[in-house]
Amino acid sequence: MEVDIVVVAGEPGGCGVGDLVGLGREGLVLNEAAEGFGMDEDLFLHPNEQRSLVGGPESLGTPDLHPKDEDLFLGTPDLGHPRFLLNHDWKSETAGGWGIYSQRMESSPVSGTNLLETAASSYLRSARHQPVRWHPWGEAAFTRAQAEDKPILLDIGAVWCHWCHVMDRESYEDAEVAKIINEHFVAVKVDRDERPDVDARYQAAVSAITGQGGWPLTAFLTPDGRPYFGGTYIPREERYGRPGIRQVLLAMAQVWHERRDEALETAGSVMSAIEHNESFSGGGGDLSLVLVDKIAASALAKFDPRYGGFGSQPKFPHSSSLDLLLEVAMSRDPEKPETARAREAFTVTLEKMARGGVYDQLAGGFHRYSVDERWVVPHFEKMLYDNTELLRNYVHGFQSFVREDFKETAREIVGWLDGTMTDRERGGFYASQDADVGLDDDGDYFTWTLDEAKAVLEGPELAFAADYWDISELGDMHHNSAKNVLHVNSTLEERAAQGANLEQLRGLRDAARQKLLAARSLRPTPFIDKTLYTGWNAMAVTAYLETARVLRMDSVREFALLTLNRLLNEAWDGAGTLNHVIAYPEEAGAGTAAEKAPGTLDDYAFTVHACIDAWFAGGNMNFYRAAVIVADAMIARFYDSTAGAFYDAAASEKGQIPLGALGARRKPLQDSPTPAGNPTAASALLRLEALSGRQEYREIAEDTLGCFAGIVEHFGLYAGSYGLALERLLQDPVQVVVVGSGAAAARLEATAVARFAVNKTVMRIAPDRLVAGGIPEALEETLLQVLKPEGAAAWALVCQGRTCLPPITDAEGLLKALEGAG
């Protein structure tokens, strides 16, 4: 068959790595004239500022944003790839313009079966029927590629990813495309949720090559797994000036067989650049609160005062940065304008998000992000990790400002998680809910036409709902202009201020919501991935325990502890390691398949936090001991005792060669999309040092944060968790222990949690637990020395560092003590 081979030889519009060597002037030129990789702090590309390495928006694998194709951005900001610092003076010597030439290449079918039949991952199982001879990630695929001297086609996606489904249907279910793949490649499919270690490395590689990453990720690898080209979504046919997948496949096969030296040189350059940058060698510096304030100021510089959030579009919540701004707002001089600005950024963003279509106005819970600056039209998938972190934001907002709207949103998030995303019997939080039911819809389950609303509501309820949620004949969706994304035009309180009766408005809203939700429940429901991921479940445990304490929701606390017990029983293998997966969905029939997914730094760090939070929730020493055990295992498996900081994945066993890009060691710093592994680990160790008294925990945490201090301010919005960890390091921990039971203890506990502070922890304990062995070692040194106040039914002990104040029996006295400790 005759195919067109695309020649990319245009003027690059920026790059991700300064030392890439291209594939020659006749085609797929990446950068022939790079002048070396630099650490120039002045030219730093944030994810939403990254540009294509290989030319304009039509370049291979670099989808541009068309008015009706915002989805083609494919999550680059969500990935958060501020990974590469560039040289100012890098320029291309390639000729401008584009060229096309043709060559005859024959393809023929290759016998073989799809090897995903026994996969446990929901994403991989969804591809079992495809004619492409997919392999799961593993040694067998690489062995075959090297034995047959074939390049590897790597597809990385997720079960919740709309454009992954589109590419599956358009291309990987097409017999002609499958024939080309099976003839010329060894095909490997990876679930990014199941293997974040694999995804992170190839995202960095493709971002280096094209300036963008996202899902689906489509990468072309040497047989040993080093990437020589890649992109994101590739259409089946040529579209928007981009070649179709058949052209790309045949071009990549030709490159491997006819211009192999150039492909190998490019692959080597990409891998070297990734490993150099991901280790952050030479990024150390001084630690101070000035650095925290610089990170906060960088986030504030992007704050949108009109619509909330940061930047323009697409908009992501950036939960860690929101908490950092709240910390600044509550702990800095209230007279300074930046303190007021931080408070404004936090509160306005939470207000606008909860009013927008990015929030499910009927069932609660947040979609992944908004494609517009107003938070109206989202990408409709709902992720566990987004909702646990946003739940914490709203709980912290209620703590600090006693805002009933923040409390209501937090309760609604819990309601959605409880009803849709949990295994109520055994414990555990499910991973995600898909955006769509079918490939031809875009959020149709969540959106409404005016006629659909009229079929459910009538009279005053219809009139109210249409006005309140902006339901009209002209909707919001590009694929169906009649479809409306429900979002709040003006709040009930704003309407009441104009003279309406607030209680009547609330009654109308609640009645309309209940009827619309009941009608929506009759629609086909988007797929829920019931995989239980260790790190995400640990994040959920922490969020639930905070919520339970602040909002006094005992059932939420009990479910969190049930989940944590399951995590420790099923993900901890008894040999000192955590698995990345607690359990796969029952329909996978995977049995012990979770053992095949190795735990990452995130899994360990979030689990340490969850265990500490569980101890504070009830004083069960088993959770404290688990925190110590998991923390010690985390240090043993991931800590770089020579250069400092933590790797995201454990080193290969002695004598084993890591597969593909897993040979590149990474030290995660940026929040993308969850809080980054290194600051999360450092924060966990600081909390544990305050309980255990083990100084090495603090030393490792300080060393870890110091490794990035010279570079982290450039990460701005993506460094929120680092700022919070550094704040925790530099401020003495404040521990509030409420001793007793009944109403008096409840009042003291409510006072203790009344304001968010990153360095404050609160626990309530029975008097008989204040004995040697009943509390952690460091607390024994302080709490057991304090005399019980005579005749008091309950009292509070406030300890800062290693010093405790005398027992406090009244709420007013406790509040004053906390103000002094803050």
Where are these regions (language model features)?
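Extreme N-terminal basic, low-complexity initiation segments
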Residues: 2-12, 65
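Polybasic, low-complexity intrinsically disordered segments
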Residues: 16, 20-103
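Replace the tail clause
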Residues: 99-543, 547-550, 588, 656, ...
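Tandem alpha-helical RNA-recognition repeat domains
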Residues: 326, 330, 395, 399, ...
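Short coil/turn connectors between adjacent alpha-helices in alpha-solenoid helical repeat scaffolds
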Residues: 331-340, 551-552, 617-622, 693-695
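Glycine-rich, acidic and aromatic/proline-enriched surface loops and short helix-turn segments
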Residues: 352-359, 562-573
